Amino acid sequence: MKKKFITYGSNAFLQSSKRIIEEAKSLNIFDETQRYEYSDLPDALKSSPLFLDKKKGGHWLWKPYVIYDSLSKLNEGDILIYSDSGCELKNPDGWKIELELLKHKDAIFYQYSENRNYAFSKFNPAFNDSPKLKHWMKNSLKETFQPIFDNEKWLEKNKLMAGVIIIKKTPDMMMVIKQWLDVMTFRPDLVADPLLFEKQSLEFSSHRHDQSVLSAMIRYYEDKINILIKDEMSEYDHDNQIVKASRRVDKTEENQLKSFLKSIYHRIKN
């Protein structure tokens, strides 16, 4: 059973993707690592209107693609670990324990916990501090997915992280990731930020793009396929933490040198 680690990095996160690959190798847990970047994406994906917003890097459309692409090349039963390049990897013993869970489950997804104060309102006073999905999904996405649910209880569940995902290659998981990719590819309107004229509910805080789509899908499948949903342990510092969502942007060697020379200049000047 192969264990493969992947990440993606482009533009500001290119150096971070190189750094996290070295962290992954140093853990001596993964049999293979792969770093994707923009040039690895197919032209059909690059032509998506989601890539017109350079600030959001394609609204993370590349994420389900790189996961599906890697899964497609693995054998049945192999394990794929995806992490955002801004994260930091640690604790090899903790990784061994976490991956043991895949003996009985086909995937591990991480949800924001009801018992932690994420202080979302510090970023924007209009944001609700609750991680419930109803606050983090625009109306058009809610309305699109609602018909497949029996009621609206799924919106009272917490949103999932899309920054760390652990998946075993099985037919069910290939189906789920392909559907995630298809929704983001063929319905970019459900992924992008709501337009100014689109009315949102009073409880709406912000639309979370790839995370919102993934959350809706996994909340539908959680009692239909063999997956595990756990409270995340990557935000802030925790004992036995295996991933920290530090959102780290590593400087290139060139920028590090520029910063160093700039600091020397100011010391001499003063």
Regions found by a protein language model. Name each.
Residues 1-270:
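Glycosyltransferase catalytic domains, chiefly GT-A lineage
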